[in-house]
Amino acid sequence: MTEQKKKLEKLSGVKGMNDILPQEAGLWEFFETTVKSMLRSYGYQNIRTPIVEHTQLFKRGIGEVTDIVEKEMYSFTDALNGENLTMRPENTAAVVRAAIEHNMLYDGPKRLWYIGPMFRHERPQRGRYRQFHQVGVEALGFAGPDADAEIIMMCQRLWDDLGLMGIKLEINSLGLAEERAAHRVELIAHLEKHMDVLDEEAKRRLYTNPLRVLDTKNPAMQEVAQNAPKLIDFLGEESRAHFEGLQRILKANNIPFTINPRLVRGLDYYNLTVFEWVTDKLGAQGTVAAGGRYDPLIEQLGGKPTAACGWAMGIERILELLKEEQLVPEDEGCDVYVVHQGDAAREQAFIIAERLRDTGLDVILHCSADGQTASFKSQMKRADASGAAFAVVLGEDEIANGTVGVKPLRDTNANGGKNEQQNVPAEDLTEFLINAMVATAEDGDD
């Protein structure tokens, strides 16, 4: 007597770490192609760093009293050697680590870009996930406001390339370390006068990272934050000149911006310029790109003092905007779907499919789902569902006559406006299909 097999429990993904399914992947590919083209046009080079880094990298780089390090990192102890490791919550520190480790700056400044998944342990919601994807740039070795302006303008070009409207730029200056120290004294004194209004999070940050109190979303604290001493009033001559230089370049290039004195960013490595690109179309998660200047970071991670600036943008949030503004490109499907009946036709179908791929056409070859040969009718349904422009048909008659059937599957002028099957000599198939594809493309442009 055999035991009845127990039904296995269906496994699901980790909450906040989402699958990107085929029907969504086309939008991702569209964005990735667009952003990579933009990055190349500015002379940026791709760098790829590991997903896992030593925990100390982020503690030293991001700051021990930041939300990311205190509450959001996925950290673990390596069972093999006891090392403390972390799945990257952001990538600037890792890129800087790689640049130092591989002595990349020995021959001058570098323009680098990256793309990939990041990980933060937080409550999943629209636009905020535990695994999320970022694309970012790091301009290493550039000290002037012109570099700040260029990386900001890169974002504007990307919005234009994607067709996105209404993303607004906010900028601020965090000045230099001594200016922040003077402001910190005044800020703490101001906040101490309003202890009865501060929430627990603000009280916790008061003496460790008081700048972050200004970034509060608590309605009860808005007036206190609004009336707090502004860091911009503490800027010295050098910091003011840098900030004014940035503004001049942005104005000269017709990049509108707002100065937001409460813009501080959540990472400790920033100085001088900080900026965010924000939208009101994504609810609470309105920041789609953010960055600034982080001159102290390279030295902080063991390198020689080197100026640097960069930005990162959340890909999921940008894709949400593309959907919101109905800018999702249509899936064009493949070019050709090959259907066949009989052993001889199947063998020839493989040869034809490979020959067509050699010309650059995208080709799907019908394969059986159950090991049995499907009828022509069933295969044609699959061809229609694939989104292919043409079906190539091979059966006993076609093999005997040395021909191939070609049937348009979309509305097209390639066959006199008729979607009727034509028989084409096998040796002429490639030329026929290429001409038909050109005619179809011209039809679509009319």
Swiss-Prot record:
Reactions performed catalytically: tRNA(His) + L-histidine + ATP = L-histidyl-tRNA(His) + AMP + diphosphate + H(+)
Location of the protein in the cell: Cytoplasm
UniProt GO MF annotations: ATP binding; histidine-tRNA ligase activity
Pfam (any one): HGTP_anticodon
Matching InterPro entries: aa-tRNA-synth_II (IPR006195), aa-tRNA-synth_II/BPL/LPL (IPR045864), Anticodon-bd (IPR004154), Anticodon-bd_dom_sf (IPR036621), His-tRNA-ligase (IPR015807), HisRS-like_core (IPR041715), HisRS/HisZ (IPR004516), HisRS_anticodon (IPR033656)
NCBIfam families: hisS
Family according to the record: Belongs to the class-II aminoacyl-tRNA synthetase family.
Subunit comment: Homodimer.
Listed name of the protein: Histidine--tRNA ligase
